[in-house]
Amino acid sequence: MRANELQELRVNTAQELSAKLNDLKAELFNLRFQLATGQLENPMRIRQVKKSIAQVKTILREKELKVIEQ
């Protein structure tokens, strides 16, 4: 994700981020399935999706910590 996409994610609610996380996990599952069957065209996409999942999880955790501090 680009920096501006990350800024857009930070504005989203926790529910929207959870939905995005579920979508990314489903995409990762499909990519891994394609890899196993030899149909994956762009193996770099797996790395990108995993990084996006980590970024969304980080933003969710930041929001959790912000709520705890208040």
UniProtKB/Swiss-Prot annotation:
The keyword RNA-binding is assigned to this record: no
Keyword set, alphabetical order: Ribonucleoprotein, Ribosomal protein
GO process annotations (BP): translation
Cited SUPFAM superfamilies: Ribosomal protein L29 (L29p) (SSF46561)
Database matches in InterPro entries: Ribosomal_protein_uL29, Ribosomal_uL29, Ribosomal_uL29_CS, Ribosomal_uL29_sf
A Gene Ontology cellular-component term: cytosolic large ribosomal subunit
Family: Belongs to the universal ribosomal protein uL29 family.
Protein name (database record): Large ribosomal subunit protein uL29
Organism in which the protein naturally occurs: Clostridium novyi (strain NT)
